[in-house]
C-alpha cells in the first residue's frame, strides 16, 4: 500500500535551530569523561554542556499537530487539560516525544490507544534512561508507540526522582509491556506500580543494585588468555 496522497501523515523535517529550546542539566569535562590518564592531545581540558532538547513551540509540523490536537480534545472529554497531563512536546530530528506527568500516564496511554483519530494500538516496550544530573527527574521511562491504522509513530516520556522511583504500570493498557517493565525495573530500579509480578527478569533475585544506572560501580573479573591476562574493567582507566 502506497503512502502517496497522504502528505499530512508525513513526519516533519528537522526543526530549525532558531526554533529549538534546550535545557542544560550539567557539564561534561574531558574527552568522553576519561579520568586518570596522561592526556597529551589537549582534549582533556574540553568542557561541554550536557543538553536535553526542550519543549518545541507550535506548529510541530506534519501529523504531530493532529496527534496533539486529538490528544488534547480526548483528554478534555475526560476532564483533564492538555497542559495538566502533558508537560512538554519535543520535536527533535523528525520525531516527537510527549512528556507526560507520571500520574496521568495510564489515562494518556488509554486515550492514545482507544481514540479513533489516534489509534496507537501498539506499544513497542519501555526503555529506561538515567540522567544523574537531571535533579529531581533522574529516572526516565520512554515508550515508543505505533499507530498501525494511521501509520504514525510517537513517544511518551515520563520522569521520576531517585528518591521516589515510582511510575504507573501500563500493563493494563498494553499487556505486552509485561517483561519490558520487569527488565527496566531490573536494570534501572524504576518501580512500575500496578504491575502483576514486578520481579527481576535477567539478574539474580539477590543481585545488589541496578546495573544500567550511571552511578552503578564498574566491576569485573580478570580474563585469562594464553600468555596474557586482561584486567577487569574497574582496574582500567575510567570512562563515563
From Swiss-Prot:
Transmembrane segments: none annotated. Keywords: Cell membrane, Membrane, NAD, Quinone, Translocase, Transport. Residues 1-21 are annotated as: Disordered. GO terms for molecular function: NADH dehydrogenase (ubiquinone) activity; NADH:ubiquinone reductase (non-electrogenic) activity; quinone binding. It is found in: Cell membrane. Gene3D superfamilies: NADH:ubiquinone oxidoreductase, 30kDa subunit. Pfam families: Complex1_30kDa. InterPro entries: NADH_DH_suC (IPR010218), NADH_quin_OxRdtase_su_C/D-like (IPR037232), NADH_UbQ_OxRdtase_30kDa_su (IPR001268). It comes from the Bacteria. GO terms for cellular component: plasma membrane. It is a peripheral membrane protein. Its main location: membrane. It catalyses: a quinone + NADH + 5 H(+)(in) = a quinol + NAD(+) + 4 H(+)(out). SUPFAM superfamilies: Nqo5-like (SSF143243). Its EC number is 7.1.1.-. The keyword Hydrolase does not apply. Belongs to the complex I 30 kDa subunit family. NDH-1 is composed of 14 different subunits. Subunits NuoB, C, D, E, F, and G constitute the peripheral sector of the complex. NDH-1 shuttles electrons from NADH, via FMN and iron-sulfur (Fe-S) centers, to quinones in the respiratory chain. The immediate electron acceptor for the enzyme in this species is believed to be a menaquinone. Couples the redox reaction to proton translocation (for every two electrons transferred, four hydrogen ions are translocated across the cytoplasmic membrane), and thus conserves the redox energy in a proton gradient. HAMAP family: NDH1_NuoC. This is NADH-quinone oxidoreductase subunit C. The gene is nuoC.
Amino acid at each position: 500500500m502506497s503512502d502517496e496522497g497522504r502528505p499530512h501523515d508525513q513526519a516533519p523535517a528537522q526543526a530549525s535551530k532558531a526554533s529549538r529550546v534546550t535545557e542544560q542539566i550539567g557539564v561534561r569535562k574531558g574527552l568522553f569523561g576519561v579520568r586518570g590518564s596522561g592526556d597529551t592531545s589537549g582534549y582533556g581540558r574540553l568542557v561541554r554542556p550536557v543538553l536535553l532538547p526542550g519543549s518545541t513551540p507550535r506548529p510541530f509540523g506534519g501529523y504531530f499537530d493532529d496527534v496533539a490536537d486529538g490528544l488534547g480534545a480526548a483528554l478534555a472529554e475526560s476532564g483533564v487539560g492538555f497542559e495538566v497531563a502533558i508537560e512538554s512536546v519535543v520535536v527533535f530530528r523528525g520525531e516527537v516525544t510527549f512528556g507526560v506527568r507520571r500520574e496521568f500516564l495510564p489515562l494518556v496511554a488509554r486515550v492514545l490507544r482507544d481514540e479513533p483519530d489516534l489509534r496507537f494500538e501498539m506499544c513497542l516496550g519501555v526503555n529506561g534512561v538515567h540522567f544523574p544530573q537531571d535533579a529531581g527527574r533522574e529516572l526516565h521511562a520512554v515508550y515508543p508507540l505505533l499507530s498501525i491504522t494511521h501509520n504514525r509513530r510517537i513517544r511518551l516520556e515520563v520522569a521520576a526522582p531517585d528518591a521516589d522511583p515510582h511510575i504507573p504500570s501500563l500493563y493494563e493498557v498494553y499487556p505486552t509491556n509485561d517483561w519490558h517493565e520487569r527488565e527496566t525495573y531490573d536494570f534501572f530500579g524504576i518501580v512500575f506500580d500496578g504491575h502483576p509480578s514486578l520481579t527481576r527478569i535477567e539478574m539474580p533475585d539477590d543481585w545488589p543494585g541496578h546495573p544500567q544506572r550511571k552511578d552503578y560501580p564498574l566491576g569485573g573479573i580478570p580474563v585469562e588468555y594464553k600468555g596474557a591476562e586482561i584486567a577487569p574493567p574497574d582496574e582500567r582507566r575510567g570512562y563515563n
